[in-house]
Amino acid sequence: MTVSNTVDQYTIMSGDRSKIKDLLCNRLTECGWRDEVRLLCRNILLEKSNSSNGVTVEQLIAEVTPKARTLVPDAVKKELLMKIRTILAENEAEN
């Protein structure tokens, strides 16, 4: 089992995963990331709508995901990493 899987499993079992997810959603909204991704999707849909086939949800996701990941601010990534480390440290201290 990888470290990532172990952390994921622990956060699910401890109930902290939803807290982390809520924090991520809030931070991405606050920094404007969600608006940027929404605009990116809209632009891709407009661009692809001119083609005869249009675009499927799977194609949109495949095209947007790598770009959206690069748009996540470093400060948000660092904050989430620190939160996860804190949760793991608290767990280790309890055991």
UniProtKB/Swiss-Prot annotation:
GO terms for biological process: chromatin organization; mRNA export from nucleus; positive regulation of transcription by RNA polymerase II; protein transport; transcription elongation by RNA polymerase II. Belongs to the ENY2 family. The keyword Transport applies. Keywords: Activator, Chromatin regulator, Cytoplasm, mRNA transport, Nucleus, Protein transport, Transcription, Transcription regulation, Translocation, Transport. Component of the nuclear pore complex (NPC)-associated AMEX complex (anchoring and mRNA export complex), composed of at least e(y)2 and xmas-2. Component of the SAGA transcription coactivator-HAT complexes, at least composed of Ada2b, e(y)2, Pcaf/Gcn5, Taf10 and Nipped-A/Trrap. Within the SAGA complex, e(y)2, Sgf11, and not/nonstop form an additional subcomplex of SAGA called the DUB module (deubiquitination module). Component of the THO complex, composed of at least e(y)2, HPR1, THO2, THOC5, THOC6 and THOC7. Interacts with e(y)1. Interacts with su(Hw) (via zinc fingers). PANTHER family: ENHANCER OF YELLOW 2 TRANSCRIPTION FACTOR. HAMAP family: ENY2_Sus1. It is found in: Nucleus, Nucleoplasm; Cytoplasm. GO terms for molecular function: chromatin insulator sequence binding; transcription coactivator activity. The keyword Transcription applies. This is Enhancer of yellow 2 transcription factor. Involved in mRNA export coupled transcription activation by association with both the AMEX and the SAGA complexes. The SAGA complex is a multiprotein complex that activates transcription by remodeling chromatin and mediating histone acetylation and deubiquitination. Within the SAGA complex, participates in a subcomplex that specifically deubiquitinates histone H2B. The SAGA complex is recruited to specific gene promoters by activators, where it is required for transcription. Required for nuclear receptor-mediated transactivation. It holds the Pfam family EnY2. One of its GO terms (cellular component) is SAGA complex. It comes from the Eukaryota.
